[in-house]
A protein has these predicted regions:
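Generic hydrophobic secondary-structure signal
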Residues: 1, 5-7, 27, 41, ...
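A short, charged, amphipathic alpha-helix used as a generic interaction element across diverse proteins
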Residues: 28-52
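Short aromatic-glycine-(Arg/Gly/Cys) micro-motifs in beta-strand/loop hairpins
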Residues: 1-23
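Hydrophobic/aromatic beta-strand elements that line small-molecule binding cavities or substrate pockets
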Residues: 23-26, 55-57
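Short, mixed-charge low-complexity intrinsically disordered segments
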Residues: 44-113
């Protein structure tokens, strides 16, 4: 089958522990190419650049997965001090093992009398 880099995000608003799949990046060249692409994404971003104002901690949690903590200081009008906004990403390498399109629902029958 084919290899992907999966990116899940958790913005941690109010202690919410919901992870959402935010990107499925197809990679040609096999597992080694997918690992290299995943590591690149963990160190930069999906676009390949790292915004200057963004802080980043990258943890390699296994040979094929990373946990990224991104932080940014945000200044609100009502506060003299900036607030730190933190987002977490899980980046992993995955092999697609099944691809099945959803079934088309049957057409509604119109009954005539």
């Amino acid at each position: 089958m084919s290899w992907y880099v999966l990116v899940e995000a958790n913005e941690s608003y109010g202690g919410d522990n919901t992870w959402d799949l935010v990107a499925k990046v197809p990679v040609e060249g096999g597992q080694a190419a997918a690992i290299a692409r995943a590591e690149e994404i963990s160190r930069t971003s999906l676009s390949g650049s790292l915004p200057e104002e963004e802080g980043r901690l990258v943890f390699r949690t296994s040979p094929t997965s990373w946990l990224v903590e991104k932080s940014r200081l945000v200044r609100h009008e009502r506060s003299a001090e900036p607030t730190e906004h933190t987002q977490h990403l899980r980046i992993s390498v995955a092999e697609l093992v099944l691809a099945r399109e959803p079934a088309v629902p049957p057409k509604k029958r119109l009954f005539h009398r």
